[in-house]
């Protein structure tokens, strides 16, 4: 792989940057992005030999076809909607109970739905709160399209669900049956396993410890976190509950150290990290930041580091997660990783860490302002302090408590 990267016509970071403009030109139908892509192509042919630039153009054509195909598929899916649904398979880790309101994501005939239901009794509420295995619901309900953007600059719920592969919502009127089922689908089984971990934490740990534990270990923040969510949002540090490279690094390094102590060789360990990464990604709900970080870790195992590592990660994400850069989480995750790659230097001590933290916080500011239109100045200092507290103290302690429980 390293030899292929060295022999490539242009630096990989140039290629990923070029494809990013093409990506937004197609998925967002942006004339500005298309103009930027054409301008970069002209610069490419000016700066590099025509033979090298021609190879890059062919690669752009292949990725462009892939982007157009994915965009067409999504367009077709949004037009060919289901007329009715009688049975839905529940994805357990998406279950949320808020008062007498139940919501979850479900599958039926290869389609995904966001499902809502008004609970009829306290017994029914407790049953869904404790539900961990895969179940299929027989129901009578009404399908509808999600709400779009209500006002200028407001949250577009329809666009968000589209990035998750969901084009319709289902409001259940009556539940006719609830049947436990089995499945060979890895994603569904990991969803069930994650739900079991969440329910275990909720039933064995007090509040607010359980919120910290589910948030930092599993990337799951439930409805009972809302009051704390408002507090952390006002302080500008709610993003610390989003799983990041620090958590991924902690668990990956812990997994490697454990297996090395058991006597495994580095070569065998390298290949065992692949199934571990899949399981860990599933236990965190296939979070955008976790998948990005895991890809970078796996590529680093094969000697791909620095900007080449970041660029190759972006190329892989274009293929395996075409909607990655259409979400705020995906963009912010890659922006953090890019700034960290560009600014990380050999240095030790508090001064180096403080400097790096300040650069990252200021570097990400334009993107945070674009997506959320707000910024708390003191969040830079609080992020620096609390990131150490969360990742170096809370994360190890909560992990130990969870394992011992």
Task: Show which residues each predicted segment covers.
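Alpha-helical transmembrane segments of polytopic membrane proteins
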Residues: 30-42, 332-333, 383-391
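Transmembrane alpha-helical segments that form the membrane-embedded catalytic/substrate-channel core
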Residues: 361-366, 392-399
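Membrane-interface amphipathic/re-entrant loop segments adjacent to transmembrane helices
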Residues: 188, 234, 370-385, 396-405
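Functional transmembrane helices that form membrane-embedded active or gating regions
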Residues: 2-13, 349-362, 381-385, 405
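Hydrophobic alpha-helical transmembrane segments in multi-pass membrane proteins
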Residues: 39-60, 170, 228-380
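Membrane-interface helix/helix-cap signal primarily in integral membrane proteins
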Residues: 2, 61-239
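Membrane-helix interface and helix-disruption motif detector
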Residues: 5, 22-34, 325, 350, ...
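N-terminal leader/targeting segments
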Residues: 1-79, 292
């Amino acid at each position: 792989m390293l030899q292929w990267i060295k022999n490539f016509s242009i630096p990989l970071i140039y290629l990923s940057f070029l494809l990013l403009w093409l990506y937004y030109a197609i998925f967002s139908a942006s004339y500005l992005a298309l103009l930027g892509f054409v301008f970069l192509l002209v610069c490419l042919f000016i700066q590099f030999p025509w033979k090298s630039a021609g190879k890059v153009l062919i690669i752009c054509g292949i990725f462009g076809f892939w982007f157009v195909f994915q965009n067409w598929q999504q367009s077709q899916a949004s037009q060919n909607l289901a007329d009715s649904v009688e049975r839905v398979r529940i994805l357990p880790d998406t279950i949320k109970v808020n008062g007498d309101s139940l919501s979850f994501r479900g599958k039926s005939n290869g389609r995904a739905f966001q499902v809502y239901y008004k609970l009829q009794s306290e017994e029914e509420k407790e049953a869904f709160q404790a539900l961990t295995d895969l179940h299929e619901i027989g129901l009578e309900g009404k399908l509808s399209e999600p709400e779009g953007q209500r006002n200028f600059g407001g949250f577009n719920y329809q666009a968000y669900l589209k990035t998750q592969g969901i084009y319709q919502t289902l409001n259940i009127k009556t539940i006719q049956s609830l049947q436990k089922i089995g499945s060979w689908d890895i994603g569904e089984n990991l969803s069930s396993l994650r739900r079991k971990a969440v329910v275990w934490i909720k039933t064995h740990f007090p509040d607010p410890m359980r919120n910290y534990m589910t948030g930092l270990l599993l990337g799951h923040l439930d409805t009972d976190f809302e009051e704390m969510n408002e507090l952390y949002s006002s302080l500008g540090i709610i993003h610390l509950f989003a799983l990041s490279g620090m958590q991924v690094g902690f668990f990956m390094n812990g997994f490697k150290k454990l297996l090395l102590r058991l006597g495994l060789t580095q070569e065998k360990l390298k290949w065992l990290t692949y199934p571990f990464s899949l399981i860990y990604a599933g236990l965190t709900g296939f979070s955008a930041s976790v998948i990005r970080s895991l890809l970078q870790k796996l590529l680093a195992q094969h000697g791909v580091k620095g900007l080449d590592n970041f660029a190759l990660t972006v190329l892989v994400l274009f293929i395996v997660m075409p909607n990655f850069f259409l979400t705020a989480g995906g963009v912010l995750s890659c922006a953090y990783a890019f700034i960290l790659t560009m600014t990380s230097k050999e240095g030790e001590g508090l001064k180096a860490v403080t400097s790096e933290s300040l650069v990252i916080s200021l570097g990400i500011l334009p993107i945070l302002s674009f997506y959320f239109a707000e910024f708390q100045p003191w969040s830079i200092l609080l992020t620096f302090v609390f990131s150490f507290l969360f990742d170096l103290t809370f994360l190890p302690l909560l992990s130990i408590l969870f394992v011992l429980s």
